[in-house]
A protein has these predicted regions:
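Conserved, charge-rich beta-strand/loop surface module that forms ligand/interface-binding patches
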Residues: 471
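Bacterial Sec-dependent N-terminal signal peptides
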Residues: 1-53
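Formylglycine-dependent sulfatase
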Residues: 29, 34, 38, 47-457, ...
Length: 512
């Protein structure tokens, strides 16, 4: 009743191939839209009912820079996440989920397109340094949101987007006034099927965030004196309550929260106080990959970890509010609910403050998928990648036939439906790092259940190889590439086959 009472009162490949890539994507998108229009017209009217399990709602909540171990139920980090723990008990908690390119724009582009970086063109972060190289989400790509929009879903995107290239004159926000511009407006024609829009490109002042609303022009953004995740959860709950009375259509909602991204200190005091007594030195001693006190990265960890956990607990509380809104409105059982993150963060570990590396703290992400009555609650070590959620979720939602042929990432839906998920022994995930300004340089790798194998290439020449045995060396402290050449050769062949299969031109640097 709370839901309806509220509504009664409140209706509120390389650079030269870029043009070819755009043309190909445009052809595929037009073909796809024609196909799905015909398929949609053939559906019986009964299929459009809000409660029809063949047309479930989708609520996709993602944080930014949220480490895979940072859930209290995993007992790996001293962090408080009661709402996510509860959600994990009601759904599938994937303990080995990863981000294949652990940095914002590339990870998000892979999620939206189901294509790897050299295919979707987002080979680095969307900022003014990379604008000359065409680094932004293509309008011609068929995103999963395009598929759902074409299928009759009401769609909304709330929060961080970070898939548009900044162009001068830059939008007048603080993070566009330095040497590198980061923030950019996303015009309606670039929103890939999202009708409701309360978003920004990238903006890290979490206590005073800015947003563009659906009809706002480029210079018509507004600021909010509220912690970003709270504001975004408020807007998400409004959308859910409004859509709950629309019995003729399902909905797809994305809530993209920026915390626990930097700045970690920009979090309400009520969450900070929860970690005042945390013994940071004892915690650092438990993590052998954290440098000693008095080193730059060691001090970085000690200065920020309390606030990082505070951000996570704040995000957890907002997730709980959104889940409760679904339950209050009677939508929880017909909603496929996902919580995850675009990547993790090293937080000073291995001498790295940020991410964009192959260490577990950067690659591993939380992933919870809940659909009451359809997905069996359990923990699974299935190595699902952030980017795999495109085909996997659409298949679970009954839209497998509408997944475009451009999608490269893996559909795990048949495993999701198993009462006890059986992980394939040969399962692995790729790792990417690209140089947008120099396609002859970068890194490629694979992460298996036991090993992390990565090759660095500069100007077309292999310069370094890393091999970590995470079973005997979970902290990834010892590169054993030189002492295990046979293992490296085997993994190299697997990587070469993968790059060939996905038409990554980087393969030529590993085969000569």
């Amino acid at each position: 009743m709370r839901c309806f009472s509220y509504l009664w009162h409140t209706f509120s490949f390389e650079r030269h191939s870029f043009a070819t890539l755009r043309g190909y994507l445009l052809i595929m998108k037009l073909t796809h839209l024609l196909y799905t229009s015909a398929a949609l017209a053939a559906l019986p009217l009964a299929a459009f009912a809000q409660g029809n399990p063949s047309r479930p709602n989708l609520v996709f909540i993602m944080a930014d820079q949220f480490r895979g171990d940072a859930l209290d139920c995993l007992q790996q980090e001293p962090v408080q996440t009661p709402h996510l723990d509860q959600l994990a008990s009601e759904g599938i908690l994937f303990t080995e989920a990863v981000s294949s390119y652990p940095v914002s724009s590339p990870a998000r582009a892979m999620l939206m397109t189901g294509m790897y970086p050299m295919a979707n063109g987002v080979t680095g972060n969307c900022n003014s340094l990379n604008t000359p190289y065409g680094v932004e989400l293509s309008t011609e790509a068929v995103c999963w949101s395009d598929v759902l929009k074409q299928a009759g879903y009401a769609t909304a995107y709330i929060g961080k987007w970070h898939l548009d290239a900044p162009h001068p004159p830059y939008v007048d926000t603080y993070n566009n006034r330095g040497a590198v511009a980061w923030n950019e407006w996303c015009p309606p024609e670039r929103r890939h099927g999202f009708d409701r829009w309360i978003a920004y490109g990238t903006y890290d002042n979490h206590l005073h965030p800015m947003y563009w609303d659906t009809l706002a022009g480029r210079d018509e953004f507004h600021y909010v004196n509220q912690w970003g995740p709270v504001y975004e959860a408020d807007r998400a709950i409004e959308f859910i309550r409004t859509e709950s009375v629309q019995s003729d259509r399902p909905f797809a909602l994305v809530v993209s929260m920026n915390p626990p991204h930097t700045g970690y200190e920009l979090v309400p005091d009520k969450y900070k106080r929860l970690y005042d007594s945390l013994d940071v030195e004892a915690l650092a001693r438990q993590k052998p990959y954290i440098p000693e006190k008095g080193t730059p990265e060691g001090d970085y960890f000690r200065a920020n970890i309390r606030n990082y956990y505070a951000c996570i607990t704040g995000v957890d509380e907002q997730v709980g509010r959104i889940v409760q809104a679904l339950k209050d409105c009677g939508l929880f059982e017909n909603t496929l609910l996902v919580f995850t993150s675009d990547h993790g963060v090293c937080m000073g570990g291995h001498g790295v403050e940020g991410k964009n590396v192959f260490y577990e703290e950067a690659m591993r992400i939380p992933m919870i998928c809940c659909w009451k009555g359809r997905l069996h609650p359990q923990r699974s070590d299935l190595p699902v990648a952030f980017a795999d959620l495109y085909p996997t979720l659409l298949s679970l939602m009954g839209r497998k036939a509408e997944i475009p042929s451009t999608v490269q990432t893996h559909d795990w839906s048949r495993y999701f439906l198993q009462e006890q998920i059986q992980t394939p022994e040969d399962a692995f995930q790729p790792y990417y790092y690209c140089e947008p300004s120099d396609p002859t340089s970068g890194r490629r790798g694979i992460r298996t259940a036991r090993y992390t194998y990565v090759v660095d290439v500069q100007k077309g020449k292999v310069t370094q190889t890393w091999l970590y045995d995470r079973t005997t060396d979970p902290g990834q402290l010892h590169n054993v590439a030189e002492s295990q050449p046979a293992r490296c050769d085997s993994l190299r062949q697997t990587l070469i086959q993968w790059l060939g299969k996905t038409h990554d031109p980087f393969v030529k640097y590993l085969t000569h």
